[in-house]
Amino acid sequence: DDPNDYMAKCGAKWLHKNGVNALCISPGKKNYSHVNNPLERIETAIAWLKSHGNRKIGIMGMSTAGMDSLVAASYFPDITLTFGLTASDFVWQGFEQGNKDGCKEWPIPGASTLSWRGEPLAYMPFVYEHPVYWQKIEEETKGSGDIERSTCLFIDSEKAREHTEEEMIMVENIKGKLFLIGADDDPFWEAGKYIRRMDQRLKERPHTCEYVPLVYEHGTHFVLPESMLRMALPVGLKFVMKFIFKAAKDYPNECEATRKDIDRRLSAALKEWIQE
C-alpha cells in the first residue's frame, strides 16, 4: 500500500529475523487504493529477486494484499511459499481511498483490483455504489466497538449475485506450501468462510501444493504473528488492540493466543522452507 508503511517495514523486519530477504511492493507512496494494479509488478519483483541471488521466492500479504498474494501465487509458479492472511477467495472490484464527497473509500465502476497484460481481472462487483458504499460502512461501524466494519459490503454483494468461476482465485495452481489464515470474528469481511471455501475447492480439484487452512474463532482482522506486532508496538499491544477491535476487547487472551500460534506456525514454515 505504501513503500514507507510502518507495518510493512515491521513485516520486513520479522521476515529478516526469520532468515529471509524481503521486498515490499506498492502502487505508490501513500497510495492505499487498489485499481487495476498490474500483476506484472510482482512478476518484475520475482525476476529482480532471482537476479540478485535469491534462489527461492515466497509471498506474504494481509488484508487486500492477502488476496493479491494468492492471485500472484496462482499465476507465478516460481512462488513456492505463500502466506495469505485474511485473504478472500475471489477478486474484488477496484476501489480508491482518500476523500471524495466526505467518503474515505469508494468503488471504481468497471475496474478490478488487479490486472494482467493490460486487462482487468474478472471481479466481484460491489452491490453498493458511491456514496452509499461508504455510508454502509459507517452504518455498520457505528456503535460496533470496531474501528471499522465492512462485512455488509461483501455479504450483500455475494447475495446480489453468484460468483462467476472467472473471478474466483485458482488456488489449485499455487505451488509449494500455502497457508490460509483468518478469524471468524474479522470485522472487515468473512475471512473464515472464504478459507473454508478455498479448502473445499482444493479438496475438489487436483493440486500439488501442500496447504494449511487456519481459521481461528478469535483473532480480529489482525491475524499477524505476535512478534511482528510487538515490533510495531513493543509496549501496550493488547491495550491498543482493545481500542481497535471489539473482539480484542472481549477476548484479549484468545486473540493473543491466536497471534502466538500463527507466529509459531509461520516461523516454523519459513525455517523448513529455507532448509529444503
What do these predicted ranges mean?
Residues 174, 180-182:
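Short beta-strand/loop motif that positions the catalytic acidic residue
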Residues 6-12, 159-169:
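Alpha-helical scaffolding within the catalytic cores
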Residues 196, 204-276:
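C-terminal catalytic histidine-bearing segment of alpha/beta-hydrolase fold enzymes
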Residues 8, 176, 190-204, 228-229:
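Short alpha-helix in the alpha/beta-hydrolase fold that links the catalytic acid
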Residues 21, 26-31, 88, 219:
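Short beta-to-alpha linker loops that shape the active-site pocket of alpha/beta-hydrolase fold enzymes
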Residues 2-3, 44-135, 150-162, 173:
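Primarily recognizes the serine-hydrolase "nucleophile elbow" in alpha/beta-hydrolase
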Residues 5-24:
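Short amphipathic alpha-helix adjacent to the substrate-entry channel of hydrolases
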Residues 185-189, 220-222:
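Acidic catalytic loop of the alpha/beta-hydrolase fold
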